[in-house]
């Protein structure tokens, strides 16, 4: 099994008197991560899977005495898919408060804020981490540099979900199953999501517009609804870790677009499954979009795994000057332009940005140099 970057961090945080919570989309390997953590431990452990109705009901209704009977002599309690339990925040608080010697390990496949379940009850009582599909750094440590280079096209098309990479011959079927609602099954359980067909249309529209600026008004017209519904559904898709937003950067220049936004997918394979397009790169018209989506998502994984805290944006002006992706850290900027064809790597960054802001680094990212920017 491929060792996840955050495993060392989790192991170092065990028995600090706080719950350890790992959130991320379904099937990114959260349960496997905890199994790997537990392989090296001998404490008695209780495993609870909240996809099972009886487990959900038991946890939701249990008082402190009933929790004591449930936990027994176990020193580690693993609660899987915890977001499915009503009032899960209070349940976890009750366990951490009443059983200080018990280590809680909790997974959630969507942001608990979907139902405002977690933050307030567990303030000061948790370590929380986000797990993504495999990062380039994790794959390099497991398989080496040559393998990472050789599998680039495959990852652009099929993505980096663990199950997909472990069963490449079944990648299409597995991705279709994952993208056809299983990935956002928690979202579909919400009362506020009354139109699953609309959600599917919206995902398709977003997949087609990857790397392009998005207008809620235009999306609403495309899928046949109103702006408010589009905004609400997009917010929920972000909280299920299917898509993420980049805002346009604007500060000093009057020509900068102030309300611009783009949406990217956490994983290329999910984006391609939504569009039902797994054609090889040589036969595609969207290679540039695949490359940009892939690099930005990999860069964000690398920043997260390395503990680099940056603000991420794109940049565009009313004069059509643009920068694909930029990061701000401590008042300095790193600029990135993505070019799949290395022969086009002589692009220059806009002089107006270079003169207005303090630029630490800039790079035209191609298949020849990308790895240096996405390893932890």
Name every feature range the model reports, one short phrase each:
Residues 7, 12-25, 31, 36-45, ...:
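A cross-kingdom feature that marks ATP-driven nucleic-acid transaction machinery
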Residues 46-73:
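Short glycine-rich substrate-engagement loop in P-loop NTPases that contacts/grips substrate
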Residues 71-88:
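Conserved P-loop NTPase "ATPase switch" module shared by AAA+ and STAND
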Residues 78, 103-109, 130:
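Structural recognition of the conserved hydrophobic beta-strand(s) that form the central parallel beta-sheet
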Residues 83-105:
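Conserved Walker B catalytic segment
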Residues 107-111, 117, 133-134, 368:
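A short beta-strand-to-loop transition that corresponds to the Sensor-1 phosphate-sensing loop
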Residues 112-127, 143:
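Short regulatory helix/loop adjacent to the ATP-binding pocket of P-loop NTPases
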Residues 130-301:
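Interdomain hinge/linker elements that couple catalytic modules in large macromolecular machines
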């Amino acid at each position: 099994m491929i060792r996840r970057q955050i495993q060392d961090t989790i192991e170092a945080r065990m028995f600090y008197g706080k719950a350890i919570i790992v959130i991320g989309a379904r099937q990114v390997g959260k349960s496997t991560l905890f199994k790997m953590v537990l392989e090296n431990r001998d404490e008695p452990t209780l495993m609870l899977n909240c996809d099972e109705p009886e487990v959900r009901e038991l946890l939701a209704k249990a008082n402190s005495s009933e929790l004591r009977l449930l936990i027994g002599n176990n020193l580690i309690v693993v609660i899987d898919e915890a977001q499915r339990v009503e009032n899960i925040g209070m349940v976890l608080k009750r366990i951490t408060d009443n059983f200080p010697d018990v280590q809680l390990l909790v997974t959630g496949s969507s942001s608990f804020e979907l139902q405002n379940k977690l933050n307030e009850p567990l303030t000061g009582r948790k370590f929380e981490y986000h797990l993504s599909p495999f990062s380039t750094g994790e794959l390099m440590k497991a398989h080496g540099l040559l393998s990472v280079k050789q599998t680039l096209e495959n990852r652009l098309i099929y993505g980096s979900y663990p199950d997909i990479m472990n069963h490449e011959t079944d990648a299409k079927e597995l991705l279709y199953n994952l993208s056809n609602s299983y990935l956002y099954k928690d979202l579909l359980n919400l009362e506020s999501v009354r139109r699953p067909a609309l959600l599917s249309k919206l995902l398709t529209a977003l997949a087609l517009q990857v790397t392009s600026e998005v207008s809620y008004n235009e999306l609403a017209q495309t899928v046949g609804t109103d702006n408010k519904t589009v905004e609400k559904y997009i917010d929920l898709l972000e909280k299920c870790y299917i898509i993420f937003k980049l805002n346009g950067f604007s500060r000093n220049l009057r020509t900068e677009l102030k309300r611009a936004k783009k949406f990217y997918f956490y994983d290329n394979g999910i984006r391609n499954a939504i569009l039902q397009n797994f054609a090889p790169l040589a036969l595609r018209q969207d290679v540039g979009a695949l490359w940009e989506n892939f690099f930005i998502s990999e860069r964000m994984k690398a920043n997260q795994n390395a503990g680099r805290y940056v603000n991420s944006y794109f940049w565009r002006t009313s004069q059509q000057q643009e920068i694909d992706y930029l990061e701000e850290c401590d008042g300095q900027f790193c600029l990135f332009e993505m070019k799949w064809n290395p022969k086009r790597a002589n692009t220059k960054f806009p002089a107006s940005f270079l003169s207005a802001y303090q630029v630490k680094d800039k790079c035209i990212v191609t298949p020849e140099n990308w790895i240096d920017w996405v390893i932890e």
